[in-house]
């Protein structure tokens, strides 16, 4: 998986005709963060930040996943979303 393919997928996902479902967006977010930052490096958000906690939990589940694997999963998911929602 090349950085260029990953960067293209990151741009493509911004131009989907329809916004993906929340679970799909969490998948995209968590794999993007794992590919670009690595293992989670922040504290879990507070009790009232439900959206922040969901994003944190999704990213935290990928702890230990390699950058390459996260990039590959991200690009594959974006390709699926492009077929499902159009671009």
From Swiss-Prot:
Principal place of residence: endoplasmic reticulum
Q: Which residues form the ACB domain?
A: 2-87
Residues making up the signal peptide according to the UniProt record: none
Swiss-Prot/TrEMBL GO biological process terms = fatty acid metabolic process
Gene Ontology CC: endoplasmic reticulum; Golgi apparatus
Concerning InterPro entries, the annotation shows:
Acyl-CoA-binding_prot_CS, Acyl-CoA-binding_protein, Acyl-CoA-binding_sf, FERM/acyl-CoA-bd_prot_sf
Keywords attached to this entry: Acetylation, Endoplasmic reticulum, Golgi apparatus, Hydroxylation, Lipid-binding, Phosphoprotein, Transport
The cross-references to Pfam families, in alphabetical order and at most eight, read: ACBP (PF00887)
Q: Which GO terms describe its molecular function?
A: fatty-acyl-CoA binding
Q: Which residues carry this modification: N6-acetyllysine?
A: 8, 19, 55, 77
CDD domains from the xrefs?
A: ACBP (cd00435)
What Gene3D superfamilies does the entry give?
A: 1.20.80.10
Subcellular localization: Endoplasmic reticulum; Golgi apparatus
UniProt modified residues of type N6-(2-hydroxyisobutyryl)lysine: 55
**Assembly and binders:** Monomer.
Q: Which family does it belong to?
A: Belongs to the ACBP family.
What does the function comment of this entry state? Binds medium- and long-chain acyl-CoA esters with very high affinity and may function as an intracellular carrier of acyl-CoA esters.
Under which name does UniProt file this protein? Acyl-CoA-binding protein
This chain is encoded by the gene named DBI
């Amino acid at each position: 998986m090349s950085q260029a393919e990953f960067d293209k997928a990151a741009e493509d996902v911004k131009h989907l005709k329809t916004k993906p479902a929340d679970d799909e967006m969490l998948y995209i977010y968590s794999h993007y963060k794992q590919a670009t930052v690595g293992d989670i490096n922040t504290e879990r958000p507070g009790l009232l930040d439900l959206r922040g906690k969901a994003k944190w939990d999704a990213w935290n589940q990928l702890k230990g996943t390699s950058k390459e694997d996260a990039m590959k999963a991200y690009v594959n998911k974006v390709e699926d979303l492009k077929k499902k929602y159009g671009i």
